[in-house]
Amino acid sequence: MNEKKLRGLYLVTYDYYGAEFYEKIIDAIEGGVDILQYRDKTNAYSVKLQVARKLTSIAADYGIPFFVDDDPKLAKEAGADGVHIGRDDPPIEQVRDVFNGLIGVSTYGNLELATEAEKKGASYVAFGSFFHTDTKKDAGIYDIKILEKARHFVKIPIFVIGGINLETITKFCGYSIDGIAVVSAILAAENVKKAAKELKEKVEDIINGRC
């Protein structure tokens, strides 16, 4: 589990909605997705457990890390590599009582929150949103310049998320980050695999300082 790299193109899912859900996830991974997170705010726990177990298997087949959003119990029961938590979720200490895998933490636009997360054992932090996003309509929008300082505050992987697409992704050129997370930029695309491939190329350029 821990040898899987926390780096690159990070896909966060929509809520589960049927068989096509898995097809799109597989297409996205084959297009270049490096990390997968299952986020589902509407389905019953029994459905989410079934879906999370299926995604655990898919991610394992492709050798990529798989995270469950919000719920350490679900992550444990599904056999996921990690859980991702935000400000409305239990703190890292409580998560550790339930789940012993990787922990990703949303740190929004707060460098102190990122530092605290690292000290408590977070595996990575995720800053954002930096742009408007329809996926989380109540998400705050933060100043991208916070990324100029982020690497001085934390040594663990830094991801960015929120309203990122082929146009806005170029705004991250020149910043020291480890990966970029998207939802609609891939899953709402007409050709999911092609969208993932195009984003992956941009992500690789950014995290390797080629832009």
UniProtKB/Swiss-Prot annotation:
Any one of the GO BP annotations: thiamine diphosphate biosynthetic process
SUPFAM superfamilies from the xrefs?
Answer: Thiamin phosphate synthase
The catalytic activity, as recorded, is: 2-[(2R,5Z)-2-carboxy-4-methylthiazol-5(2H)-ylidene]ethyl phosphate + 4-amino-2-methyl-5-(diphosphooxymethyl)pyrimidine + 2 H(+) = thiamine phosphate + CO2 + diphosphate; 2-(2-carboxy-4-methylthiazol-5-yl)ethyl phosphate + 4-amino-2-methyl-5-(diphosphooxymethyl)pyrimidine + 2 H(+) = thiamine phosphate + CO2 + diphosphate; 4-methyl-5-(2-phosphooxyethyl)-thiazole + 4-amino-2-methyl-5-(diphosphooxymethyl)pyrimidine + H(+) = thiamine phosphate + diphosphate
Which parts of the chain are coiled coil? Answer: none
Q: What keywords were assigned to this record?
A: Magnesium, Metal-binding, Thiamine biosynthesis, Transferase
> Which residues participate in Mg(2+) binding?
70, 89
- Family note: Belongs to the thiamine-phosphate synthase family.
PANTHER family in alphabetical order: THIAMINE BIOSYNTHETIC BIFUNCTIONAL ENZYME, THIAMINE-PHOSPHATE PYROPHOSPHORYLASE
Protein name (Swiss-Prot/TrEMBL): Thiamine-phosphate synthase
| Organism (species) | Thermoplasma volcanium (strain ATCC 51530 / DSM 4299 / JCM 9571 / NBRC 15438 / GSS1)
Q: Which gene is this protein's source?
A: thiE
